[in-house]
């Protein structure tokens, strides 16, 4: 193309300069895609049927005036809360009429466009509903459905776990539930201020009922923390029940659409049947039956952790799309005098900033789907479990243990990764990334709570590391372990493995590299653990000494899981037309991950210094390859401009026009003087000069 060409081209009915206008650049970039974008979308969505259903739901959301987001970024807390409640009320209508899978799709899409509404719904359906379904009997579940829990009719549930004084240490919660044999009731109490339920989403304004995590005390014996359903408000007038105190915890960093509150209980009596008794049972005489595994009582927590891995992909794909579309139309500087400025996507360093993140977002999808399938299978087994089925119970216990470990590590590292994606893509968009209208600031403030709630990421990571050491100990005893750590069975073969001239673009070699690193870290930590036990420490003390090793083990094991799941999904499900483009992303992700942690592979002896140079060259190579098709990769996410909700990331590439229009629509020109002109600005500018205001310069 002639760089001095000033002709025009028509795109979607508009004329643009053939070289300098952003929509032309976007059209050119889109034309570079060599693979069928639609097929890639089907792959990501799990099939054409799912894509068509997603598109139907997206269109319904976009066309509903209640979900208009034109002024979303300018709303205050009170306005957001009211709008969120209106949207929840509308979405509840679909719950009554649609299949569960369609409802999940609708909620997931809402989570991209409006995290507050998604969470306010999730508090009831994910946490309250999940707890009743997961830890209540079939009869109890049916009872609460009949009361309106299914379709939010005269009923709204919340989840009272966290306390002012305890969060991560679930076993340390202090709210009490004392059984009164005379009345066949539990008495719920908040014994002191630190036991106040805190951060409870939905409590401040909305919830009529809650699942309370409280200490089960029968005949003076403490049986640990169990779950109870407690009514908070009277149904007819929404006033508080006797003994219930509730307040609003006020301004938060983000997610203002959620009415987080605090709750205190003072001698609140509930029927014995309100203890959720799928696993822990208390009969009329006060006889207590405990489950074989405490985690069975907390199965509802897994729901949130698994969904957050999927959420990380959903939100991450929105922001990597914005940054890459912007990079394809934004021009800055010129590497050749007299030539037009260069697209920032063509700068190698900018490619390195963004393209590994694109690969990471794809990797999150593969692993989240895999763990989601494991979760669904496990929950079905739990639902079908009969009280006298000991073999089935043992199988469920084994599955739950594995799911707790896998979901803990994945929740931690995926939510951290998404936070990183949001912030790094913001920085990659320069000053315009700082504008509220491009969504980064709001999304980051809304997102980062994911790194804390339902398990602080650092604590979850240590928990996952502990489980890995326990698995290694079990293997040494000849006991079975879960599929997620089955590679540890080959540890002796892997311990001293090296690259030895093999190709670093072979997926099997790359997965092996991570298995060697993870296996070595886990087994060294296990050696240290057994040594500490031999020296007289108990298990908790030994694990505490090994905190850093546990964290590192979980980190490397989880990255290995992400990489292996990515390659496996490509191998088993990708069609020929999209297989190589997906492999390019998977190879970029695996190699970049090695480069980011190169010292680890040198220490473990799998790679030599010269191999690290090769890794860097390959990362550069795959960045160059992936760069050519970035618009195809991001178009495959199939997000409309409504869900992107950032003018610099619009589909047609006309970023500056959309951005300028957005700013002016939300900030229309009025009196050029500010509202405080008369009261503050004018007196300041026209204040009378006093002697003290005059600066006299010394003359030499």
Curated annotation (Swiss-Prot):
Q: Which GO terms describe its biological process?
A: fatty acid beta-oxidation using acyl-CoA oxidase
Q: Which cofactor does it need?
A: FAD
Q: Which family does it belong to?
A: Belongs to the acyl-CoA oxidase family.
Q: What class of enzyme is it?
A: oxidoreductase
Is Flavoprotein included in the keywords of this UniProt record?
yes
Protein's pathway = Lipid metabolism; peroxisomal fatty acid beta-oxidation
Q: Which UniProt keywords apply?
A: FAD, Fatty acid metabolism, Flavoprotein, Lipid metabolism, Oxidoreductase, Peroxisome
Which cell locations does it reside in? Peroxisome
Q: Where are the transmembrane segments?
A: none
- Any keyword Oxidoreductase? yes
Quote the EC number.
1.3.3.6
| Catalysed reaction equations from the record | a 2,3-saturated acyl-CoA + O2 = a (2E)-enoyl-CoA + H2O2
Instruction: Report the InterPro entries cross-referenced here.
Output: ACOX_C_alpha1, Acyl-CoA_ox_N, Acyl-CoA_Oxase/DH_mid-dom, Acyl-CoA_Oxase/DH_mid-dom_sf, Acyl-CoA_oxidase, Acyl-CoA_oxidase_C, AcylCo_DH-like_C, AcylCoA_DH/ox_N_sf
Q: To which species is this protein native?
A: Yarrowia lipolytica (strain CLIB 122 / E 150)
Instruction: State what this protein does.
Output: Oxidizes strain chain acyl-CoAs with a chain length of 10 to 14 carbons. Also active toward the 2S isomers of acyl-CoA-esters containing a 2-methyl group.
List, alphabetically, the PANTHER family matched. Answer: ACYL-COENZYME A OXIDASE-LIKE PROTEIN, ELECTRON TRANSPORT OXIDOREDUCTASE
GO MF terms, alphabetically ordered: acyl-CoA oxidase activity; FAD binding; fatty acid binding; flavin adenine dinucleotide binding
Chief place where the protein resides: other
Subunit composition?
Answer: Heteropentamer composed of five different subunits.
Which Gene Ontology cellular-component terms appear in the entry?
peroxisome
Highest taxon of the lineage: Eukaryota
Under what name is this protein listed? Acyl-coenzyme A oxidase 2
